Curated annotation (Swiss-Prot):
It comes from the Bacteria. The gene is rpoA. This is DNA-directed RNA polymerase subunit alpha. Its EC number is 2.7.7.6. The keyword Cell wall biogenesis/degradation does not apply. It comes from Cereibacter sphaeroides (strain ATCC 17023 / DSM 158 / JCM 6121 / CCUG 31486 / LMG 2827 / NBRC 12203 / NCIMB 8253 / ATH 2.4.1.) (Rhodobacter sphaeroides). Residues 1-234 are annotated as: Alpha N-terminal domain (alpha-NTD).
Amino acid sequence: MIHKNWAELIKPTQLVVKPGADPARVATVIAEPLERGFGLTLGNALRRVLLSSLQGAAITSVQIDNVLHEFSSVAGVREDVTDIVLNLKGVSIKMEVEGPKRLSISAKGPGVVTAGDISESNGIEILNKDHVICHLDEGADVFMELTVNTGKGYVAADKNRPEDAPIGLIPIDAIYSPVKKVSYEVTPTREGQVLDYDKLTMRIETDGGLTPDDAVAYAARILQDQLSIFVNFEEPESATRHDVEDGLEFNPLLLKKVDELELSVRSANCLKNDNIVYIGDLIQKTEAEMLRTPNFGRKSLNEIKEVLSGMGLHLGMDVEDWPPENIEDLAKRFEDQF
């Protein structure tokens, strides 16, 4: 009876990603159908995690030659240091290495200094190279040393000042989140003849360091991980079937090999690499365990769930005394039933 609390709730069967004008930055993600009220619950939770908890990169401090503090001005530069610092906050960075790291800008006037003038290093990419940092007049000569780091959320400038900071180092407010905007809408949707379900539509804009659909996937994974501690019981459902005629204590379908399920090459290879041979091996895996399998993503998970559902099975089931000692002999004995 316990499993009915979650097993009998409708689950979304469609996840559609509609790319925006810039697919790497903007997209609409639609999930349906959801139980009534779950659109609001999931939409709000995902939005908060998307904006606050995903890892990103930002400039955390700057040191400009011949500048002692942020209320100074630089000869030949139209903007004062306060404006330069403000503009540096708007530089979008993608880091695939652990920080902090040092980058620099060296420029001479006349001209415009943009984010594209920042020196890049291995594992660090400037995403908005056209972003303006300052304007230089004739004869101006500017050198800046930037510190970049990874983190999440918002970190105030005073937290970015090292204890041994040299004179002239100016800490900067760091906005690490790669997600810039998130909005969601919940509308009614139909499932069969029933219209009393939710459709969740999320519109997501990132800085380009993370695609919108990946951002949603990471946010969902964070929620999944945070909620797991509240589950204080083992799955009670069992795939056992006492069949006197067959002489088995479980459903013979569990003896079918997964390579007979007509899965995509990617899904089949992931199962093979994880040493999952029989359906009995597969159904005892939870969704979380499957998603931890290398190269195994949400698309493969949905494919496998759909195939198992058609057989009256699902992930996370319990099979007593599995695998049987004579599993290969049993598989040959019942292969005609498959």
